[in-house]
Amino acid sequence: MRVKNKKLFRVLGVVLTILVVTSLLGVGLQSIEAAEKERPIVVGSKIDTEGALLGNMIVAFLKAKGFKVVDRVQTGTTKVVREALISGEIDIYPEYTGNGYFFFSGKTDASVWKDFEKGWKTIRDLDKEAHGLVWLRPAPANNTWAIAMRRDDAEKANIKTLEDLASYLKSGGYFKIAASEEFVSSEAALPAFESGYGFTLSNDQIVVLSAGNTALTEKAAAIRQDGVNAAMAYGTDGQLAALNLVVLEDTKHIQPVYAPAPVVRQEVLDRYPEIEPLLEDLFATLDLETLQTLNGKIAVDGEDPKKVAQEYLKSKGFLN
């Protein structure tokens, strides 16, 4: 009888141990899951004006929706911020679809990146497979290389597109552009425009500015520095309207489409799937004119990017 009791006690002891261990494991797993849910979302961005604007929008919007957020806005250059996302140092940042051509050099046809929808879907599929990154739907804007002219000169010569510019140049019209060395020499920039539209600028028609940013090239055109009446620009540059410059339409789609989109690590979306519709609704409101205006408040008027972002979110009903 004692032997049977001993066996019974042993069995009960084993069962009790299993129950205790299972219970502890359950509590442990719940704690891990809870901790995962409590992990903050780290938001980064590039260091430029638009990077600061979009990054601050994402930070403010997610905070307003109750997410814990770590602000790493203006993380660094494209290379720095992308590597931070891939390594998991940050969880979200806004990137441009056209950069997919360089991220996956040699793996796609260049023409893909000149189409808004195809470019987005291509980088979405490539980055998800290669790095577990998810490209949400981009904003309906294109921040690509562009040529801008003084509005008065463009209107006087009836120049609205790069095709118009080509005809104007062939007829001997006056034109002088301020640009960076990269814009002048990169096969993807001025040479691509020249080849695509059938014109060639002489050295006398180009002023290369060493600093190489659009803030300086656009200002040079605005004040006619050294006779300049045109400038290297980006499509969403904030000071274009303020400086009375107009972007000439790239009717042949020579340049890739650089549409800004939130890029999120897959594991973060798995934890917080509601982020996707929230950010896509926000970015759907950011068309070209809107981004130019908002960028202008920062670059021209000197307003704080956080303030500009929050005021815009309030105006659209995203913040109370």
Residue ranges and their predicted role:
Residues 1-40, 320:
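Short, low-complexity disordered leader/linker segments with a strong preference
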Residues 37-50, 67-74, 173-179:
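Short, well-ordered beta-strand elements
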Residues 49, 71-83, 181, 204-219:
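Short helix-initiation/N-cap motifs at beta->coil->alpha
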Residues 49-68, 191, 195-197:
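Short, polar/charged alpha-helical segment
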Residues 65, 88, 224:
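Conserved dinucleotide-binding and phosphotransfer motif residues
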Residues 72-90, 97-102:
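Acidic helix-start/capping segments at beta-turn-to-alpha-helix junctions
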Residues 91-92, 228-230:
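Short, Asp-centered acidic motifs that coordinate Mg2+ and/or phosphate
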Residues 98-191, 195, 199, 203, ...:
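Contiguous mixed-secondary-structure segments that line small-molecule binding/active-site clefts
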